[in-house]
Amino acid sequence: MFSNWNIFLNYKNFTINQEIKNKLNLYYQILIEENQKYNLTRITELNEVFEKHFLDSLLFVEQFQIIDQKIADIGTGAGFPGIVLKIFFPNIKLTLIESNNKKVNFLKYLVQKLNLNDVEILNKRAEELNEYKEQFDIVISRAVAYLNIILELGVQLVKVNGMFILLKGPKAYQEIKDLKNKDQKMNLKLINIQELEDTGFGTRINLFYKKINHTNNLYPRKYQQILKESK
């Protein structure tokens, strides 16, 4: 059982109570029990999971308030950051997007065990979700792909005036440079950069893009085409 709850008290815009603590402990227990079956994470030590996965999933909330928005998490894997957000902000409407079948099975089991409501799990690739075009207030992704790839994969899902939030590491500035204004072509505007330095989880650079107009029908292209251009 985790006990160092003080690590969650140094940040604004989210609070922690006993119900949240219980769910996070259960989340950890399920994650470790199922990890060998599903290959979910290389980080398994208790304190590391709570800091490098759970807390790291929340750091962007310092800069952007979460209340009851409709949120899509692209490439959620073991549920980071989406499930963590749902535990702390139960009023959000959450869609988890994951193309790996085994991880989808884990997510379904996890959502059931945590007794989470208003969670949709899609076993698809983000660029294939044409029926979800401009449906989400927030699209978020944590360490899934290079910036010029992930922006194109997910841009169609974001509402006009909605946010595309990317949880990144120390290479984020180089990735921004490599975009070569591709974000502007997709009607995305970088409105905020959050920099965090901590010995526990290293350098974190979170990017906040606002969608300022509808997505051009050119985007997203087929994944292999996006990938080929990015090389």
UniProtKB/Swiss-Prot annotation:
Which UniProt keywords are present, listed alphabetically? Cytoplasm, Methyltransferase, rRNA processing, S-adenosyl-L-methionine, Transferase
InterPro entries per record? rRNA_ssu_MeTfrase_G, SAM-dependent_MTases_sf
User: Where does the protein end up?
Assistant: Cytoplasm
Is the keyword S-adenosyl-L-methionine assigned to this protein? yes
For this chain, one GO molecular function annotation is: rRNA (guanine-N7-)-methyltransferase activity
Per the record, its GO cellular-component terms are: cytosol
**Primary site of residence:** cytoplasm
EC supergroup of this enzyme: transferase
Instruction: Give the EC number.
Output: 2.1.1.-
Cross-referenced CDD domains: AdoMet_MTases
Which residues does the annotation say bind S-adenosyl-L-methionine? G75, F80, A126, E127, R142
Biological function? Specifically methylates the N7 position of a guanine in 16S rRNA.
Identify its protein family: Belongs to the methyltransferase superfamily. RNA methyltransferase RsmG family.
Q: Known NCBIfam families for this protein?
A: rsmG_gidB
Q: What is this protein called?
A: Ribosomal RNA small subunit methyltransferase G
> Which species is the source of this protein?
Mycoplasma capricolum subsp. capricolum (strain California kid / ATCC 27343 / NCTC 10154)
